[in-house]
Curated annotation (Swiss-Prot):
This is tRNA uridine 5-carboxymethylaminomethyl modification enzyme MnmG. One of its GO terms (biological process) is tRNA methylation. The keyword DNA repair does not apply. One of its GO terms (molecular function) is flavin adenine dinucleotide binding. Gene3D superfamilies: FAD/NAD(P)-binding domain, GidA associated domain, C-terminal subdomain, tRNA uridine 5-carboxymethylaminomethyl modification enzyme MnmG/GidA. FAD binds at residues 19-24, 131, 191, 380.
């Protein structure tokens, strides 16, 4: 058990971070890495790194974000590698561009791993306290963060403040029709006074909600009635610094709801907090409660329920798929209607939690607020949902909070073409959100480039140049790049004719022209393993280098075209839009987009991109239209 810190030696910090969740931990560590004297304030030190909802990290798009956080020397990847008990790569039947690393975690092991990292971090102190307010000074005529006030009355001076409050900002828990309980998580008090302070400083707060399912007793489940779901035979670590997964691996299991389950839920919808107008705020669209599933999809006879162990030594199981705010007795009845759970014991009931968030359009791409200099938001306060989304915002907010202390440092901003984190932040600050925002591969225009395997190649050097990445990690990247370059050179120097290939049972276009080994990788049926069979000397390279170059070679022609598209897109960001443009003539533009553009009359592509509701696809259509218009004008002249 960690000692509680009641006092701190100094009363002034460069950066103060409020919240010890996934966003707060990454923000505090990032600020400390850049060199700022940083203080992390959390209401309970023992809850640092707590997985409030599902015991898992990663998934489709989300897993790429974890890799990106790790590439920037973040914490999440290292922590999950010490706690993973069921690891898998989702979408393995599809291309690497949509692979999604995911790991079930031992809750206690993850929390311990994160606390071990945070409590021993250089330049970072941790204080157990509650922040109730913050003050500002005027800097060049604009308000700027000056201090934070604790519930005990103590004032801490700081030049930069990161709020990563999660579901605690004005948090309220609901179960059934009972009166809501003020809490950010079951058993933990909310940050009510801080929410009022934000309002006093001119921020308009909205409300969102999320939910969690009951926890059930492992020993009361009839596992023979469920389907086993094994993890990957060789677990893949999240961190580029991890050699292997250390904990034993276990299976997850699948069962399904049925018509009886749905009847029980349907008969009690009027008693569920989420459906009884007690919590009339937006819920996560892509992680709905069982009440929402039954109501929105009446044609479905069943829904999957994933039974996920919460730890190697824990008797608690997380039934993923039945998040609920029904009364407790209804929750148990509903669970016992599911195959394999007929005699299940409930260890903890499910609930809905509603909380405050701020319209993320009030932020710059650095996640600094437009209203107050030095004030940054990260995580669910920006309208997102998910551990991974929170961590990605945390690392950007913390880094920029520290970098902004010096005029010699440029802001750390990730573009949509550079990272899923960049896609997410750009979506948030330009489009805003009216419901909990979640990342998907479909949100990224350049997902062929934004893969989980190359996050370090994309971001580590960028982070190193910003002072965010350690010499050790940069050295690992440098060595990896050197080996990959040697391998690519070897593949370009090695060639073979189609005729010789055919003798080996490999058939390509019989035009007589020699093909280099690297060019062969672009053939649909040729993999790096086949090249190794042809040229065994390639085995002298590491499996990591062979895998990375294999993917790059497979996608090489497409990546080259995409790189040209990205460069063209960036150049056209400042391209002017003629005042006489008719948006009704732009092919592929929705009526809604046409109306918004007509009203706003943006003068450039960049200005059009920042109109709420105008998607990247719409921008691409406008660019194509302007190109065609330009060519037609040139031909006519």
């Amino acid at each position: 058990m960690f000692d509680i810190i009641w006092l701190v030696v100094v009363l002034s910090y460069d950066v103060v971070v409020v919240g010890g969740g996934h966003a707060g931990c990454e923000a505090a560590a990032a600020a400390a890495r850049v060199g700022a004297k940083t203080l992390l304030i959390t209401h309970k030190i023992g809850s640092i790194g707590e997985m409030s909802c599902n015991p898992a990290i990663g998934g489709v798009a989300k897993g790429v974000v974890v890799r990106e956080v790790d590439a920037l020397d973040g914490l999440m990847g290292q922590a999950i590698d010490k706690a993973s008990i069921h690891s898998t790569i989702l979408n393995q039947s599809k291309g690497p561009a949509v692979w999604g690393p995911r790991a079930q975690a031992d809750r206690d092991a993850y929390r311990t791993a994160m606390q071990d990292i945070v409590l021993g971090y250089k330049n970072l102190e941790v204080l157990e306290a509650s922040v109730i307010d913050f003050s500002t000074d005027n800097e060049a005529g604009s308000p700027c963060v000056a201090s934070v006030t604790l519930s005990c009355g103590k004032v801490l001076h700081t030049r930069r403040l990161v709020l990563a409050t999660g579901t605690f900002l004005g948090g309220m828990i609901h179960v059934g029709r009972d009166k809501g309980i003020p809490a950010g998580r079951m058993g933990d008090k909310p940050s009510t006074r801080l929410a009022k302070a934000l309002c006093a400083h001119g921020f308009m707060l909205g409300r969102l909600k999320t939910g969690t399912p009951p926890r059930i007793d492992r020993s009361s489940i009839d596992w023979s009635a469920t389907a086993e779901q094994k993890g990957d035979l060789v677990p893949t670590p999240f961190s580029f610094l991890s050699d292997a997964i250390v904990l034993p691996q276990v299976s997850c299991y699948i069962t399904h709801t049925n018509t009886k389950t749905h009847e029980i839920v349907r008969n009690n919808l009027h008693l569920a907090a989420s459906c009884a107008s007690l919590v009339d705020v937006a819920a996560p669209r892509y992680c709905p409660s069982i009440e929402e599933k039954v109501r929105r999809f009446p044609e479905h006879k069943s829904h999957q329920v994933f039974l996920e162990p919460e730890g190697l030594d824990s008797n608690s199981v997380y039934p993923n798929g039945v998040s609920t705010s029904c009364p407790i007795d209804v929750q148990l009845e509903m669970l016992r209607s599911i195959r394999g759970l007929e005699n299940v014991r409930m260890l903890r009931h499910g609930y809905t939690v509603e909380y405050n968030f701020v319209d993320p359009r009030e932020l710059h791409h650095t996640l600094e607020t437009k209203k107050i200099k030095g004030l940054y938001f990260a995580g669910q306060i920006n309208g997102t949902t998910g551990y991974e989304e929170a961590a990605g915002q945390g690392i950007v907010a913390g880094a920029n909070a520290a970098l902004s202390l010096s005029q010699n440092h440029a802001p750390f901003v990730l573009k949509r073409s550079e990272a899923y984190i960049g896609v997410m932040i750009d979506d948030l600050v330009t489009l805003g959100t009216s419901e909990p925002y979640r990342l998907f591969t479909s949100r990224a225009e350049y997902r062929l480039r934004l893969r989980s395997d190359n996050a370090d190649m994309r971001l580590t050097e960028m982070g190193y140049n910003a002072g965010l990445v350690s010499e050790r990690r940069f050295g690992v990247l440098y060595n990896k790049k050197q080996e990959m370059d040697r391998l690519v050179d070897e593949l370009h120097r090695t060639s073979i004719t189609p005729h010789t290939l055919s003798k080996c049972g490999i058939f390509i276009s019989q035009n007589g022209e020699k093909k280099t080994a690297f060019e062969l990788l672009g053939h649909p049926s040729i993999t790096m393993d086949i090249l190794i069979q042809l040229w065994p000397s390639l085995n002298s390279f590491s499996r990591a280098a062979l895998a990375a170059v294999g993917i790059e070679g497979k996608y090489a022609p497409y990546l080259q075209r995409q790189a040209a598209d990205i460069q063209s897109f960036l150049e056209e960001e400042n391209a002017s839009i003629p005042a006489d443009i008719r948006y009704s003539e732009v092919h592929g533009l929705s009526k809604e987009a046409q109306e918004k553009l007509q009203r706003a009359q943006p003068f450039s592509i960049g200005a059009a991109r920042r109109i709420p509701g105008i998607t990247p696809a719409a921008i691409a259509n406008i660019i194509i239209h302007l190109r065609c218009r330009g060519r037609a004008s040139h031909q006519n002249s």
